Each structure stands twice: as structure tokens, then as C-alpha cells.
Regions:
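Short alpha-helical transmembrane segments in multi-pass integral membrane proteins
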Residues: 1-19, 76-143, 189-246, 302-367, ...
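Residue-level signal for short hydrophobic patches within transmembrane helices
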Residues: 12-31, 35, 57-64, 101, ...
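Transmembrane helical elements of multi-pass membrane transporters/channels
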Residues: 17-33, 137, 171, 204-208, ...
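Transmembrane alpha-helix boundary and packing residues in multipass membrane permease domains
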Residues: 22, 26, 38, 74, ...
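Helix-terminus/linker motif at the lipid-water interface of multi-pass membrane proteins
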Residues: 27, 31-49, 118-125, 181-192, ...
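Alpha-helical transmembrane segments and their lipid-water interface positions
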Residues: 29, 33-36, 40, 62-69, ...
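Small-residue-rich hydrophobic transmembrane alpha-helices
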Residues: 48-111, 145-159, 163-164, 276-338, ...
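Short runs within selected transmembrane alpha-helices of multi-pass transporters and secretion channels
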Residues: 69, 73, 138-157, 164-175, ...
């Protein structure tokens, strides 16, 4: 680990040194979803609404693998803190082997069952056709996305986060270029609409993976971390990762699944409500990436600091990250509340849709007053290695969230802006549960 960071205090400056590159990389990656939404918002309302369903459906599948990589990141962080650098490479290679196999299984299963599942879930024929087209062309990119997730886990776990910024810039530029060409039809190619968005995103993920491979070979100390040659597969190594990785995999999958169900509920309120929620989802991502940079930093620094033997410093570290997070997020919330129509125009140029989106945008932005504390504290729990407990805590929050959504959306069929108050419920419950667990100290002396 960087010697400037390897200390038990982790000042605000050192926290920022880790968080800022993660933030920039996540902002750049968020641009992929933003460009998909912004471009499709200029194709039509059906395409805009369908992309909400299709993107979240894809994310449910992607989060199975991404959740596994988060568990691997926690283990890598612990080994890095302990100074067992070659073991970080073993974790990387075995995680990569597992995710490549998993991607093949998920792609095959989705090809078989996606048409049936979409038919069950979507009531609009136009939305069904467009969403299925997106999913069919987006799935092949999952192989590249899973491999990239393991590279990200390695670089975040070893606190070499500057790499992420460069990768994200390359990925976003590629995605914008591919989408512009394929969605609208340039350089003699046909205008593919929502299908072009899916193909463009998959190609961008391939470019991202190529960048990581080239960068690792050229810049990373591969011998130090055991990346100079592929590790021989050992079932015992993978089994040793599973107690941590399984729970992060399940937790991330269930979390996004409930998000997907939320959009299915909204879809039954009509195509306009779905389009408004997709704008709110896209705008939410702007704040979300900032929050995730701090919460991801919290997870990896907690894991590293425990590996260094400074369990007594964990709570003070978490409090520093909380203060820094709220300072930045509250400033963003204020900007959203002052300029909601400006934010909405990023995603659509339909005047009536811009006006209709404002109430939902305001509710969504203010919900981060709860979500900020919830995510930072929750990722701190995961960073201790208590991933099974973290899963249970989020499960409690998600059950309450789904009950609330079912009542206000499915039964009462309230206005779409009121639907977004569900985010307050989720964030508040998660924050309370995570804080109680961290204060209890039951995570101390946990080995992974």
C-alpha cells in the first residue's frame, strides 16, 4: 500500500486521495448510463421507458458477478493491509476464473428465459419489444464486464485507485462514440435506436477490459502481486473466498432485484410515469456515484486498517468518511433543488416531460439525506468482513422497502413523485441497522 496511506489515522486528505480517483471513475462510468438515457430520450418515450426496464434487468444479472467482485475486493484489501501481496494475486485470479464461468451460465440462461420473463413483467407491447431487443444485444458484453469488475476489485483493494480514472475516461469516450454512431446511424451505418445503445455499451466494456490488461502489463508490479502469470486453479482457494463473496453476491443481486421490481410497479402506472422515473433514475446516478466513491473507500480502508491491526481506529475512520460524504452530497442536493428542470433537460428535450419530472427529481435528491449515512455505514460493515451480517441488515431494509412500495404503488397507485419516497424508507432503515451493528463491536477479531 502507498506508504502515505498506510497509517492508522487516515486523515481527510488521505481518505480523499483514495476516494477521488474512485469518484472520477464512477462519474465517467455513470456517463455510460447517462448517454444511453440522453440519446434514447431523443428517440422517443417508449425507448426511454424501455431502456429503464432493460438496463435494470441487465443490472440484476450483472450484480451477481459484481457482488462477487466486491467480496473479493474486501479480501484483497485485508491481504494488502497484512502485507501478503502475492495472496492478493491469488484472490484476483480465482475470482476471474469464477466470474468468466459464471458469465457464460448467465448469458445462456438469459437467452432462454428473457422473452418469457419480459412477457410476464411488462404490460406494454411496445416497451416489451424494445426492452427485449436491448437485453439480447447487451448480454454478450457481460463477459467483458465481469472481467473488468475483477480488475477494479484488485486496484481498489490495493488502494491503487488512480488507475480507475484513466480506464473510465477511455470507457466513456468509447461508449459515447459507439452510441452516437449506432443509435442515430452515422458513417453509413443504419440508425439502430435502442439496439444500438446495447451494442455500443458492450463494445465500450470490451475497450475497458483491453485497457486494464494493457495497463496491468505495462505499469503494475506484477511480480509483487502475483500477476506475472495466471495462478494454477485451486478449489480450496476459491472455497476460502466463498464465505465472504457469496454473501456480497447475494446481497447485491437482491438489492438490484428490488430496484427492478420498483420499476415494474411504475411501469403499470403508465408509459409517462415510467419515462419520468427513468429520468429520476438517471439523475439519481449523478449523486449515487459520488456517494459510492465514499462508501467504496470506506469499505476498502476499513478492510486495510483491520489488516494492519488497528481495529480500534475503525469507528473514527468511519466518522471522518461520514462527515466528508455529507458535506459533498448536501451541496449536490442543494443544486438539484435549485435547478431541477436543468437536470431533467439532460435526459429529454420533451417540454411536458421535463415539467412533469420535477417533483420526482426533488424527492429523489432529498432522499440522499438518508441514503448517504445508510450506504457509508453499510459498506463499513462489509469492509469488516462481516458480509453475512451485512446481507441480513440489507435484507431487513429491503423487506421494509418492498412492503412500502407494494402499498403505495401497487395498491394505492399514488403519483410517481410520492413513489420515490420509498428511497427515504430504505436509506433510513439501512442506516439505523448498520449503525447499531457497528456500535455493538461484534465485528471485531473476525478473520477472513
Amino acid at each position: 500500500m502507498d506508504q502515505q496511506l498506510k497509517c492508522c489515522t487516515y486523515s481527510y486528505r488521505n481518505i480523499w486521495k483514495v476516494a477521488f480517483p474512485i469518484l472520477i471513475s464512477l462519474v465517467m462510468e455513470q456517463m455510460i448510463g447517462l448517454t444511453d438515457t440522453a440519446f434514447l430520450g431523443r428517440v422517443g418515450e417508449v425507448e426511454l421507458g424501455a431502456s429503464a426496464i432493460a438496463i435494470v434487468y441487465y443490472m440484476v444479472l450483472f450484480m451477481i458477478g459484481f457482488g462477487f467482485s466486491i467480496g473479493a475486493q474486501i479480501i484483497i484489501g485485508r491481504r494488502n493491509g497484512e502485507g501478503n501481496f502475492k495472496d492478493t494475486g491469488k484472490v484476483f485470479w480465482h475470482g476471474l476464473y469464477f466470474l468468466l464461468g459464471l458469465s457464460g451460465v448467465l448469458i445462456a440462461a438469459s437467452e432462454l428465459f428473457s422473452p418469457w420473463l419480459m412477457r410476464l413483467m411488462v404490460s406494454s407491447e411496445a416497451v416489451y419489444t424494445a426492452a427485449l431487443s436491448y437485453v439480447s444485444w447487451r448480454l454478450p458484453g457481460m463477459v467483458f464486464a465481469f472481467a473488468t469488475a475483477m480488475f477494479r476489485a484488485f486496484y481498489v483493494g490495493t488502494t491503487q485507485t488512480k488507475t480507475l480514472t484513466l480506464n473510465a475516461i477511455v470507457m466513456v469516450v468509447s461508449n459515447v462514440l459507439f452510441n452516437w454512431i449506432l443509435i442515430f446511424g452515422h458513417f453509413g451505418l443504419p440508425a439502430l435506436g435502442i439496439t444500438g445503445a446495447a451494442i455500443g455499451s458492450s463494445l465500450a466494456e470490451l475497450v475497458s477490459l483491453i485497457f486494464f490488461i494493457v495497463y496491468t502489463r505495462a505499469k503494475c508490479d506484477r511480480r509483487k502481486y502475483g500477476l506475472d502469470r495466471p495462478a494454477r486453479f485451486q478449489a480450496s482457494e476459491l472455497r476460502g473466498m466463498m464465505p465472504v463473496c457469496t454473501w456480497t453476491m447475494i446481497q447485491h443481486t437482491i438489492s438490484v432485484t428490488t430496484w427492478f421490481i420498483f420499476f415494474l410497479y411504475i411501469e403499470h402506472l403508465g408509459e409517462r410515469a415510467l419515462a419520468i422515473s427513468n429520468i429520476a433514475r438517471g439523475a439519481s446516478g449523478i449523486i449515487w456515484v459520488v456517494l459510492q466513491s465514499f462508501s467504496s473507500t470506506c469499505s476498502t480502508l476499513v478492510s486495510n486498517i483491520i489488516g494492519e491491526g488497528h481495529q480500534d481506529k475503525v469507528m473514527s475512520l468511519v466518522k471522518r468518511i461520514m462527515k466528508l460524504s455529507y458535506g459533498v452530497i448536501c451541496a449536490m442536493i442543494l443544486l438539484f433543488c435549485i435547478f431541477p428542470e436543468t437536470v431533467a433537460r439532460i435526459y429529454t428535450d420533451i417540454p411536458s416531460l421535463v415539467t412533469a419530472s420535477v417533483p420526482a427529481l426533488l424527492v429523489m435528491a432529498c432522499s440522499y439525506l438518508c441514503n448517504t449515512g445508510g450506504q457509508v455505514l453499510f459498506l463499513a460493515v462489509s469492509g469488516t468482513g462481516s458480509t453475512k451480517t451485512a446481507f441480513r441488515l440489507e435484507l431487513i431494509a429491503l423487506v421494509v422497502y418492498m412492503i412500502y412500495c407494494t402499498v403505495i404503488i401497487w395498491w394505492l397507485r399514488v403519483d410517481v413523485a410520492v413513489c420515490w419516497t420509498a428511497e427515504f424508507v430504505y436509506g433510513g432503515v439501512l442506516m439505523l441497522c448498520s449503525w447499531i451493528y457497528l456500535r455493538s463491536g461484534r465485528w471485531k477479531n473476525r478473520s477472513i
